[in-house]
């Protein structure tokens, strides 16, 4: 059964990392697409004018698009382009979804948890 947290229009459940789980080691300058699997647990459909936007942390990636409508209860893969820094180290970045009015939402009871990536750039 789909978990609904209080009948909010826009909210999601985080189902997992599709690729590049936390602490994945990447090469300096490597480019890739980070993907997360989520479920729309809200009461409203996400449309193609929604975006996946960078909100804080290390700015190692760009924004992504919602590429098809996601109805309540449906799963979706959210993607953003990443470019690993040239300098070795640990980098973390955080993204949320924005609706067509620019309002942000994430996952969790209050919708305030961000989708995250944590990479280790090799020396």
What are these regions (language model features)?
Residues 1-123:
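Intrinsically disordered, low-complexity Ser/Thr/Pro-rich tracts
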């Amino acid at each position: 059964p789909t978990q609904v947290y209080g009948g909010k229009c826009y909210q999601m459940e985080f189902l997992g990392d599709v690729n590049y789980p936390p602490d994945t080691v990447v090469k300096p300058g490597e480019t890739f697409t980070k993907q997360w699997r989520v479920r729309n647990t809200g009461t409203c459909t996400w449309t193609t004018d929604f975006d996946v936007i960078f909100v804080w942390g290390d700015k190692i990636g760009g924004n992504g698009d919602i590429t098809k409508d996601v109805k309540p209860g449906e799963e979706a893969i959210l993607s953003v382009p990443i470019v690993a820094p040239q300098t070795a180290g640990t980098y973390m970045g955080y993204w949320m979804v924005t609706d067509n009015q620019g309002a942000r939402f994430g996952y969790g009871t209050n919708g305030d948890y961000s989708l995250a990536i944590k990479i280790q750039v090799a020396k």
